[in-house]
Curated annotation (Swiss-Prot):
PPR repeats lie at residues 94-129, 130-164, 165-195, 196-230, 231-265, 266-296, 297-331, 332-363, 364-398, 399-429, 430-464, 465-495, 501-531. Involved in RNA editing event in chloroplasts. Required for the editing of a single site in rps12 transcript. Keywords: Chloroplast, Plastid, Repeat, Transit peptide. This is Pentatricopeptide repeat-containing protein At2g29760, chloroplastic. Residues 536-611 are annotated as: Type E motif. Residues 612-642 are annotated as: Type E(+) motif. It is found in: Plastid, Chloroplast. Belongs to the PPR family. PCMP-H subfamily. It comes from Arabidopsis thaliana. Disulfide bonds: none annotated.
């Protein structure tokens, strides 16, 4: 039977010493009140006990008071505010009470308060810090990622002769890893004379969390060689390391180790095993484990969903989501993210719309970032705007990820001004926010502004990363800033400590080639310290198409196909160069080779968003419900353009077509023309027509878009594979340099 009733106030007997609370507490009285404290199951009961202790004088006993305070500070119903009041009533808090206060603050919402409590302890009491004090202070330093504070506490622990204590040392290892100082963590680990399993776990999990999974596995091997018995925490860390580096063989060995050594397999460890199998691509092993698990939580279901998504079995992933006993936002996010990251943005948006129909399901930052990325890919500006409004309406914090995603979405959907507005609205910007804005400027051909922003970023004491440089080089490429790109490239390692990767080399080749410096681009490739990749040769091949350099094109294509024989893009590019030069026999031969080998040219596809719906058009497409009206508008537009001096650029026809009239008809069927015409019949001025194309816009379509913008007084924005084109009053923002 319960001692306390949760419904009724606690009934305590009148104490005979009520009139004299300062009378010394007997052992029986102390034991009785400590028993009462330990039986409390609510804050209300604890406060009743507190009041009785004050009335009876028991609270003046430091030991009893400290026990009451510990329950107020650390129990499941703890209240830091109440605990502090209890602490302040203790006449002379002992070391246990001070350490309890420090521990409570270190585990609370504001860990820095534990440091202030520590300072009060050393300045206001006769108590000295001991081996129980420092672990929680060091934990607070780790929580706020303050390396300097951690180092200071380390020094104080050494001076207090507890620096080598295993509990203190383990806390220091965790703190140094949390602050990114791996070397100091390793030094502390080596100084521990009698390492316990927590010491090893702290190192293994620290390496995993800080991106050194290989070191984690090496340390586990050493741990095993020293006959240290691993715990389930060890196994979780090791399996996470295997998952990160996709080491299925080692992961399976770990699973065997768990079975052979009878390691306790709780739900956390089972989920780690499942995660390892899915991340390593062994969906069969994952399915067997999943089916065998008697206990499952949402992490289990979401991990399995992720596994199917990784293996591109989206039907099975959907089935897992539908079968979940309780679908949470994490599961929905997993499916949206899986589609978005694997080139299926339309499917990601479909899932997002399903999520919107769910009751009591609150969107979080992860949901919004993934969905904004999908919007960016397909050009869903209206949905992106809705998400931005949702963020404002619901007070969702604009962290760096959300800010970057918004900037990226607006930029890729053609609204650069809105990107600037979002960028300027935030005071704190990290490297990803700066890089997103630089990338947006690059896509829209604002090369000089992008380079200026690169330097402003450094003035703001934000160090660029590899993505930043990629975006700056793209900006230079679209604006012809060759000298600036070369200068920044040579500064990457010397000034910024960033070793150029293959994508950076490809960017410089693109900068040189696009500006006509083909021979210089070849010499640059020959001087590369790493083997040229397909992206490098692809950049050179693309430049050869622009400048019709057949000899270099054939060489670049040969090198590219040596690395990736089934690269359809390389075949198409070379075929287009042959066609541009009138070498139709070569075109025929290359197209025949593609048919025989099963290679297919990616069809031209353009999309346009009208009233929140994405409408797609393929070249020569008749599938759209309004195709008849679209083609009627196309005929009207082309006739109007011809009457104003337009002549089709039949040199842009890259198929083998004999009759001039058929060549002209072929040009008219390009997907971007269809999308623009649909925009003309579906919207009215001054609404901007925004079109997204998957391939490079051809010269004829470029000329047509300029003329339409002039003759119909419409602003047209086209995003092709490489950049944006803003058509206004018969002119394009690219100045015909693309």
């Amino acid at each position: 039977m319960a001692i306390f009733s949760t419904a009724q106030p606690l009934s305590l007997p009148r104490h005979p010493n009520f009139s004299n609370p300062n009378q010394p507490t007997t052992n029986n009285e102390r034991s009785r009140h400590i028993s009462l404290i330990e039986r409390c199951v609510s804050l209300r009961q604890l406060k009743q006990t507190h009041g009785h202790m004050i009335r009876t004088g028991t609270f003046s006993d430091p030991y009893s008071a400290s026990k009451l305070f510990a329950m107020a500070a650390l129990s499941s119903f703890a209240s830091l505010e109440y605990a502090r009041k209890v602490f302040d009533e203790i006449p002379k808090p002992n070391s246990f009470a001070w350490n309890t206060l420090i521990r409570a603050y270190a585990s609370g919402p504001d860990p820095v308060l534990s440091i202030w409590a520590f300072l009060d302890m050393v300045s206001e009491s006769q108590c000295y810090p001991n081996k129980y004090t420092f672990p929680f202070l060091i934990k607070a330093a780790a929580e706020v990622s303050s390396l300097s504070l951690g180092q200071s506490l380390h020094g104080m622990a050494v001076k207090s002769a507890v620096g080598s204590d295993v509990f203190v040392a383990n806390s220091l290892i965790h703190c140094y890893f949390s602050c990114g100082d791996l070397d100091s963590a390793c030094k502390v680990f080596t100084t521990i004379k009698e390492k316990d399993v927590v010491s090893w776990n702290s190192m293994i999990n620290g390496f995993v969390q800080k991106g050194s999974p290989d070191k984690a596995l090496e340390l586990f091997k050493k741990m095993e060689s020293e006959d240290v018995k691993a715990s389930h925490v060890t196994m979780v860390g090791v399996l996470s390391a295997c998952a990160k580096i996709r080491n299925l063989e080692f992961g399976r060995q770990v699973c065997s180790y768990i079975e052979e050594n009878r390691v306790n397999v709780n739900l956390t460890l089972a989920n780690a095993m499942l995660d390892m199998y899915t991340k390593c691509g062994s969906i069969e092993d994952a399915k067997r484990l999943f089916d065998a698990m008697e206990e499952k939580d949402n992490v289990t279901w979401t991990t399995m969903l992720d596994g199917y998504a990784i293996s591109e079995d989206y039907e099975a992933a959907r089935e897992v989501l539908n079968s979940m006993p309780q679908k949470d936002i994490v599961a929905w996010n997993a499916l949206i993210s899986a589609y978005e990251q694997n080139g299926k943005p339309n499917e990601a948006l479909i899932v997002f719309h399903e999520l919107q129909l769910q009751k009591n399901m609150k969107l979080n930052q992860i949901t919004l970032v993934s969905t904004l990325s999908a919007c960016a890919q397909v050009g869903a500006l209206e949905l992106g705007r809705w998400i931005h409004s949702y963020i404002k309406k619901h007070g969702i914090r604009m962290n760096f990820h959300v800010t970057s995603a918004l900037i990226h979405m607006y930029s890729k959907c053609g609204d650069l001004e809105k990107s600037r507005e979002v960028f300027n609205s935030v005071e704190k910007r990290d490297v990803f926010v700066w890089s997103a804005m630089i990338g947006g400027l690059a896509m829209h051909g604002c090369g000089n502004e992008a380079v200026d922003m690169f330097y402003k970023m450094q003035e703001a004491n934000v160090k660029p990363n590899g993505v930043t440089f990629t975006n700056v080089f793209c900006a230079c490429s679209h604006t012809g800033l060759v000298d600036e790109a070369e200068s920044l490239f040579h500064q990457m390692e010397s000034n910024y400590g960033i070793v150029p990767e293959e994508k950076h080399y490809a960017c410089i080749v693109d900068v040189l080639g696009r500006s006509g410096y083909l021979e210089k681009a070849v010499k640059f490739i020959e001087a590369m310290p790493i083997p040229p990749s397909t992206s490098v040769w692809g950049a050179l091949l693309g430049a050869c198409k622009i400048h019709a350099n057949l000899n270099l094109a054939e060489m670049a294509c040969t090198r590219l196909l040596e690395l990736e024989p089934r690269n359809d893009g390389a075949h198409v590019l070379l075929s287009n160069i042959y066609a541009k030069l009138g070498k139709w026999e070569n075109v025929s031969e290359l197209r025949k080779h593609m048919r025989v080998t099963g290679l297919k040219k990616e069809p031209g596809c353009s999309s346009i968003e009208i009233d929140g719906m994405i409408h797609e058009f393929l070249s020569g497409d008749n599938a759209h419900p309004m195709s008849e009206k679209v083609y009627g508008k196309l005929h009207e537009v082309m006739e109007k353009l011809k009457s104003n001096g337009y002549e089709p650029e039949i040199s842009q026809v890259l198929q083998i077509i004999e009759e001039e009239e058929m060549k002209e008809q072929s040009l008219n069927l390009h997907s971007e023309k269809l999308a623009i015409c649909y925009g003309l019949i579906s919207t009215e001025a001054p609404k901007v027509i925004r079109v997204i194309k998957n391939l490079r816009v051809c010269g004829d379509c470029h000329s047509v878009a300029k003329l339409i913008s002039q003759l119909y007084d419409r602003e047209i924005i086209v995003r092709d594979r490489y950049r944006f084109h803003h058509f206004r009053n018969g002119q394009c923002s690219c100045n015909d340099f693309w």
